[in-house]
């Protein structure tokens, strides 16, 4: 029997502070719950949306009930007895961090049980010897930033100075990351990518998970904006991924949409599709759901929930994007094939109502749909790896080293 798996990952869509949230300073975080509360109280109204958060298709897959189990309260405005068509769980992260790479790697069988390297100082964040080596090896004349910053704010603050000097802007965050912003036209996209590649080679021994190219355009503070040509340079996963097993044992196709390929350092990816906006990500995903051959795994990361709304602490924007996604989810459901398994999940939280601008340590929703899957609560997962293990079971692959299978189809003992 030919099967397909479709994974839709809503980047940063947490559903309540996890049991270890206190260790991360994230007690009280609840991305979905706090967005729903703001919407219900008309605090997230805008020209684009108003009133309670309306996510009927996500609710039908068990989103609200998953959040109820995770946070002990139903998101405001959600139904306590929706017309349930999916099976649902919620998951605690096993990995030692709350970043994109850790969450994604864990769900494909490679939890991060070591400590990433971090740049913890808010100013003068990077060691001088590292900066000196980057300058020496790349022949840039200097750099700006060298601090923790919001990516959109730092190009407003330093973009004009960057255009005067052509010094790249170096910055970081609470994540294990070294980010480089530069003007796409004046500095040059190829030059930015080459700089990031060199910086990645220098930083890899320090276990810095990612170097990210952040190109932008514009002529002044008011017009600067980031482009869709972001590129992530990531450390390769330390364990064999589900993708690789699927290719080796079933000659499967692994189709990356958005930044998935970069997150996994292109390991086990057979096809890659980029997309710039949330609409484009939905369009490309729907196209692949319609056209990808059997024996495929389609995996999309919907980054904008995190980058445009979570980190920016934009509750109304996050709510509007969720409602747009939910409407497009209807199209995905309508185009699934007989033996498709649909999975919706997240990689961490990024509560737009919470203090600061960083990710939040939260439980994630794990929602499944298949025609032969009984709608039911599947319990609490102690690792995101349960997602990968369930996929391995569904596809008839060798089991992963981590995680347990959550799925029991009609007709199975």
UniProtKB/Swiss-Prot annotation:
Mn(2+) 1 binds at residues 11, 347-348. Binds 2 manganese ions. Its EC number is 5.4.2.7. Keywords: Cytoplasm, Isomerase, Manganese, Metal-binding. It holds the Pfam family Metalloenzyme. CDD domains: PPM. Gene3D superfamilies: Alkaline Phosphatase, subunit A (3.40.720.10), Phosphopentomutase (3.30.70.1250). It catalyses: 2-deoxy-alpha-D-ribose 1-phosphate = 2-deoxy-D-ribose 5-phosphate; alpha-D-ribose 1-phosphate = D-ribose 5-phosphate. One of its GO terms (cellular component) is cytosol. GO terms for molecular function: magnesium ion binding; manganese ion binding; phosphopentomutase activity. Its cofactor is Mn(2+). Mn(2+) 2 binds at residues 306, 311, 359. Pathway: Carbohydrate degradation; 2-deoxy-D-ribose 1-phosphate degradation; D-glyceraldehyde 3-phosphate and acetaldehyde from 2-deoxy-alpha-D-ribose 1-phosphate: step 1/2. InterPro entries: Alkaline_phosphatase_core_sf, DeoB, Metalloenzyme, Phosphopentomutase_DeoB_cap_sf. GO terms for biological process: 2-deoxyribose 1-phosphate catabolic process; 5-phosphoribose 1-diphosphate biosynthetic process; metabolic compound salvage; nucleotide metabolic process. It is found in: Cytoplasm. The keyword ATP-binding does not apply. SUPFAM superfamilies: Alkaline phosphatase-like (SSF53649), DeoB insert domain-like (SSF143856). Isomerase that catalyzes the conversion of deoxy-ribose 1-phosphate (dRib-1-P) and ribose 1-phosphate (Rib-1-P) to deoxy-ribose 5-phosphate (dRib-5-P) and ribose 5-phosphate (Rib-5-P), respectively. NCBIfam families: deoB (TIGR01696), PRK05362.1 (NF003766). Belongs to the phosphopentomutase family. This is Phosphopentomutase. It comes from Helicobacter pylori (strain ATCC 700392 / 26695) (Campylobacter pylori).
């Amino acid at each position: 029997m030919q099967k397909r798996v479709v994974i839709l990952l809503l980047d940063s869509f947490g559903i309540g502070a996890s049991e270890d949230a206190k260790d991360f300073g994230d007690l009280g975080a609840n991305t979905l719950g706090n967005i729903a509360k703001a919407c219900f109280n008309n605090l997230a109204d805008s020209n684009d949306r108003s009133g309670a958060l309306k996510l009927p298709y996500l609710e039908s897959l068990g989103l609200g009930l998953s959040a109820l189990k995770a946070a002990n309260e139903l998101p405001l405005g959600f139904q306590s007895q929706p017309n349930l068509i999916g099976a649902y769980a919620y998951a605690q992260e096993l990995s030692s961090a709350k970043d994109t790479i850790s969450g994604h790697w864990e769900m494909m069988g490679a939890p991060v049980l070591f400590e990433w390297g971090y740049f913890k100082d808010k100013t003068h964040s990077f060691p001088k010897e590292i900066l000196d080596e980057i300058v020496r090896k790349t022949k840039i004349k200097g750099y700006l930033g060298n601090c923790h910053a919001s990516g959109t704010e730092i190009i407003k603050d330093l973009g004009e100075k960057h255009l005067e000097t052509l010094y790249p802007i170096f910055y970081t965050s609470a994540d294990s990351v070294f980010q480089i912003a530069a003007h796409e036209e004046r500095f040059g996209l190829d030059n930015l990518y080459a700089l990031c590649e060199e910086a990645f080679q220098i930083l890899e021994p320090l276990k810095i998970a990612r170097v990210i190219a952040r190109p932008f355009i514009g002529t002044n503070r008011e017009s600067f904006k980031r482009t869709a040509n972001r590129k992530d340079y990531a450390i390769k996963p330390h364990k064999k991924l589900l993708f690789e097993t699927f290719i080796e044992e079933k000659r499967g196709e692994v189709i990356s949409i958005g930044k998935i390929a970069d997150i996994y350092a292109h390991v086990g990816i057979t096809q890659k599709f980029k997309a710039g906006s949330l609409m484009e990500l939905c369009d490309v995903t729907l196209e692949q759901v319609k056209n990808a051959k059997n024996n495929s795994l389609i995996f999309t990361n919907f980054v904008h929930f995190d980058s445009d709304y979570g980190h920016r602490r934009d509750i109304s924007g996050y709510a509007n994007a969720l409602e747009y996604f939910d409407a497009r989810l209807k199209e995905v459901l309508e185009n699934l094939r007989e033996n498709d398994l649909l999975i919706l999940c997240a990689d961490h939280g990024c509560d737009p109502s919470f203090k600061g601008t960083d990710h939040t340590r939260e439980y994630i929703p794990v929602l499944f749909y298949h025609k032969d899957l009984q709608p039911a609560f599947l319990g609490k997962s102690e690792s995101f790896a349960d997602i990968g293990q369930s996929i391995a079971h569904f596809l008839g692959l060798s089991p992963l080293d981590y995680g347990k299978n959550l799925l029991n189809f009609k007709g199975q003992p």
